[in-house]
Structure formats: C-alpha cells, structure tokens
Amino acid sequence: MKAFFDTIRPLFGGAMTQAQVDGCETLLAATAGLPLMHRAYLLATSYHETAHTMQPITEYGQQPYFNKYEPGTKIGKSLGNTQPGDGYRYRGRGYVQITGRANYAKAGSKLGVDLLGNPEAALNPTVAARILVRGCTEGWFTGKKLADYPDYVGMRRVVNGTDRAEMIAGYAETFEAALLMSVDVAASPAPDPVIKPAVEVPAPTGWGAIIAAVMRMFRRN
C-alpha cells in the first residue's frame, strides 16, 4: 500500500490526513475485483466530488437553498420529490451525491438499506461506496455505465455529462499509476505450445533401401 499512497500523495499537496487515507482504503476495498480503469475512475470521481476529502459529504447550503428542489419546481419534479421538505431532506450525500426522493428510493431498494427513512445513512462510508460502485457500474445516475466507455474522458458521462471531464481524467491517470504500483497485475498466461503432428517418412525401397542398410553398417562400426 505504501507505493499506492506515495504515488497519489502529490494530489493532496504532498501530505494526507488520516481521514483521506481511510477514505481511500474504503474505496479500494469497495472496488476490488473491478477492471483497473474502472477502479481508477471511481477513485478519481470520489477525489473530485468530495473536494479531495475522500469522505462522503453533504451538499453544501442552508435550508432555503434547497427550495429549488421542492415539489412543484422543475428540478423537484425531475428528482421525484413529492412532499414538502423533500428538497432539503433528500439533498446530495455520499461520495457522488445522490439527490432527490426518487434516487434515494432507488438506491435504498437496490442495496437493501432504508435510505428514504434514514437519508443520513448515505453518509456511511460503506454505504456511500456501494452507491458509488453500483451506481457507476450499473448506470443508476445518467443511464450510462462505466463499461460503455473505453476512456476516462468519456466515463464522466456516467456521473455528470462532460463537466470537468478532462481534469478528472487526469486524476484517474494518477490513480491508475498508483494501482499499478501496488497491485500485482496478472500476466496473460503463455499460449499452449503448438505441437506439429509427426510426419511419417516412408521406408526406403530399392536402391534407397540398400544405401540405408550400408549407412547403418558404417554407424555400427
């Protein structure tokens, strides 16, 4: 793990807090088994979306700010908010902030967690990591999933269109390098050797048989 943190430390100004280290470790565990680029991009997304804290965060703003998410507003309707106070109650939370009653209900149903009744549970690092991983690999947020894109710039569409796509791609490249420094990448198995069938040489006949017999006599002598 030392090589991993040595590689990413420049992203954090040369030093990391224990909370940042803990957040990275939570995300490394949550993304284990995913393709290398997907792991790197999820780490980069968390780095960007949490303002480099690597901890689940709550969307910033006083309660009046979230009135724009209330039922009856254009945004509120798109988020599935139906009850007064839903805008603030279901404001953004997590590594990649889920927002709105409909999204909390969807994530909670898929994870088996009562996020509607307890939206603060989306701030639990383990729950937040599961939302991030499954949301990005299954296409919860925009209908796009990581496997739809072969490059880091394109992967931004999984979360938020093309907003800061190039910048986050740069972060992902750093996280990819860190993962390669710390994780044994299994080499492709060597192909099975090609065994050519034996070619049967017909036994010599006539003069060929006589010459072969003479050659054998000389070898014995």
At which residue positions do the language-model features occur?
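Secretory-pathway/luminal and periplasmic proteins that interact with or process carbohydrate-rich
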Residues: 48-59, 142-143, 161-169
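Generic structural signal for hydrophobic core residues of well-folded globular domains
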Residues: 31, 46-49, 99-102, 135-139, ...
